[in-house]
Amino acid sequence: MTQQKQTQSYLVPFIIMVVLMALVGLITNLNGQFQAPMQAAFLQKSGSLTNALTTLITFAFFSGYLAMGIPSAKCIEKKGYKKTLIIGLFGLIAAFGLYELSAYIFETVDLEKFQAEVADPNAVIIPVAYYVFLLAGFVAGSAMTFLQAVLNPYIVACDVKGTTGVTRQSIAGTANSTMATIAPMLVASVIFAGKSGLDIALSSLYIPFLVLIVLVGGLIVALMNIHLPSIASAEKKEGEVLEKSVWSFSHLALGVVAIFMYVGVEVCIGNNINLYGQSLGFKPEQAALMATIYWSLMLVGRLCGSFLSSISASKQLLITSTGAGVLVLASIVTNNPYFLVGAGLFHSVMWGAIFSLAIDKLGKYTSAGSGALMMGIVGGAILPLVQ
């Protein structure tokens, strides 16, 4: 009876963790899908720097992971998982506020000057609102680092009757992929209603981000008033010294490299295929559909991956990496972007496989190892910029 009560008591925390995983998928993809409309709104008069400045939107977001990878691990060690999670959520609220501030500055300060100069072919203008938007992306990425460092351990620890750790990770991963799939069409068709260029009204950002602020605020209140399971086995005990560097674990170091490449390629395809589609003459809604198909295939792969528990993580990684590599090569040879879209089916399984292999048997080094892995996500900033 005691065990039953304990199991039932973690149902609500588990639901909150699933909602947070869905939020991570939504915000990560929202930021990336903002590239095309923000290019149209902010960077029409940025000259030859247009594409580079556009990819800086993604660069700023994923740079937060590099900057906060180690601090998030230290925060877990000093304050614990729950407080680290709440700190990340407050950071997310700050980011949402900055996104809204960017829209407000553009509408009230930049737009009049922008419209006056848009007809001048020699004018080069980068609005102040663009820099605020970059700052918002960096703060959002930093907040995501704190969230992702603690969410997976909590999902495993939140026992729910009739589930296993793998089952719960699959449920949370499905929620994450579902919201990531929705994000491209949400940006193109709902928030900006298919508009482009100066027809885009950045005031359209106000209500969506206000809703997100209220949602995250509600989650913070809920987390402050519920009991979460202990994850002490993966933490360094108070006063305990880590005898060696976390980088001395070769499988963790390789995991960081793998995460760097995995996230970099995922973002290169998932975010930039929208811009690529528009450069080929696709309408914004059509280009967004291409991105949506990519993320939809990731969702399908995630669902299929839940049935692969009998296959070792190393074999899963080998098979999916090979499959994705073949599709990328096919796209290069044929110049067909739809082969890139198909790579999403394989990408979906890689994160869990890499994470499992990288933190295997780290023990008290697990939180530090998780922070190191979060630094690898900076691949999502660097590879798209190089691309």
Segments from the language model and where they lie:
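Extracytoplasmic
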Residues: 12-43, 148-152, 269-277, 383
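C-terminal ends and interior cores of transmembrane alpha-helices
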Residues: 90-125, 323-334
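Helix-to-loop junctions at the C-terminal end of transmembrane segments
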Residues: 67-81, 191, 301-313
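Extracellular/periplasmic helix-loop-helix junction of adjacent transmembrane segments
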Residues: 34-67, 113-120
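Extracytoplasmic gate region of multi-pass secondary transporters
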Residues: 31-36, 245-292
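Central cavity-lining transmembrane alpha-helices of secondary-active solute carriers
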Residues: 55-74, 292-304
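Helix-loop-helix hairpin linking two adjacent transmembrane segments in secondary transporters
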Residues: 165-227
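Intracellular juxtamembrane helix-capping segments at the cytosolic ends
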Residues: 146-160, 348-366
